[in-house]
Amino acid sequence: MRIGFLLLLLLCIAPVSYAQTVKTGPDPSTLRDPDLERDSYHNLEVARNYFKLKKAYVASLKRCEEIIAGNPNFAKIEEVLLMAGQSSLWLSQNKGKQRPDQYVSFEGGEKRTLTSEQFRSMGIDYLKKLINDYPNGTYTKQAQEELRQLDVPKQP
């Protein structure tokens, strides 16, 4: 009788203990490759150096674009988007020590440079992406201020 009771109790408790385990792992959007994060962080440091110290906005923009394309889940992507937006806007105004025509893109095996208006719209796009994707982010207010200075209407 006791053995039967213990067996019945064991059968009742066993499913409860299996229910305690996690079926899935962490959310895939939060998983980050450590090597990719390290590489992206290095590119961010170099972009900051170009941006703040050397006023080399073409080089800074290229580094930021590399991070955005290669690691969109980067932990500091907000700062990257702000720096890319500001670099683009300042290149459209011919600010900095590098000429805007040093920014070269290849499309269909053909080199092409961007006009001031293309740099401006690219900068606005980066800043709007920052504001829309990270509305409570640490760099959102700076992005809104940049857009306000350009008289760009707010999005809903």
Predicted features and spans:
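Acidic, polar-rich low-complexity tracts and alpha-helical solenoid repeat scaffolds
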Residues: R2-F5, V16-P156
